[in-house]
Amino acid sequence: MTAILNLAVALLAGLLMTRIFSRWHLPDVTAFLVTGVLIGPFVLGRLGIPGLGFASYDQVEALSMISDVAMGFIAFSIGNEFRLSQLKKTGKQAMIIGVLQALAALAFVDVALVIFHFLRPDVLSVPAAITLGAIATATAPATTLMVVRQYKAKGELTDLLLPIVALDDAVGLIAFAVSFGIARAMDSAQFSLASILLSPLIEIVGSLLLGALAGFVLTKLETMFRSNSNRLSLSIAFIFLMVGLSAVDFTVAGVDCGFSPLLVCMMLGTVFCNICPLSDDLMNRADKWSTPMLAVFFVVSGANLRLSVFSQGVLVLIGVVYIIARSAGKYCGARWSAKAVGCDHTVQKYLGIMLLPQ
């Protein structure tokens, strides 16, 4: 009962906050995140009044399943950006920019935090600095997609943005696995090249294969139904199914592996939109159906913020260095690579800024 009440409060409070933020011309995502902080355990939730907020992080965690499913819908929707007709126009540019800007962010953060280590070795170790550099490669697909949807943005910049955000996940998986493996080797003096390379490779290839197979099966099953409502229900069921299957872990050659729910659902959407003649209508319907779920996702994300970390000045300083270095890496990497592949000045100027959310 508490979880249902918190779910209702999160959605209602988030929607009401968007009306306030719209006066300042701020996106709904910002309103949802601020709402989450306000009704989270550190503000109104601290009062312990039922229906006023999340009294504990356990209550926030109780809604984590909604967040997982919301990410599945986001990835499914991003898959729609990989239509073959569109990839013929921007695919090469998106691939080059996507890889280079991610590597630039990794390099900038690694250098900045390693320098910080030499200044304060008692606070930040080199393995931790390297791991944070790998995390810097990723861009938040949920934030990007929701802002694009809200403002109905279209054009060359948007056409490049969403595929690049999608590629970030694959690049981030490899970068994190390699960086974390190096960091672990530095800590324990054990280095396994197989585990560093095999795990992300299996995760990426396995996720893409699972998503592609599911997209093919979904397309075949859609032809069995004549009702658009039933077809929509089938699409939604497959997204839930992929999110659930992505939680399965397995071992290959002694290496622990798993699936990436983002890549699985993204590939599901990519295959579905390219081979199913009904995909346009069904994906639009799925987007509308998932809108309340995305709102709850961002409110829960805000409620998960641990405000107690701001009481530790050194951690705040590390965070500031990380944000500045990552922002510089994303912006410079996107600008330089966009110029190298011949994008127009508008793309060169603004693409890096649009890749800052994490």
What would you call each of these model-derived segments?
Residues 32-44, 96-110, 163-177, 232-246, ...:
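Small-residue-rich segments of transmembrane alpha-helices in multi-pass membrane proteins
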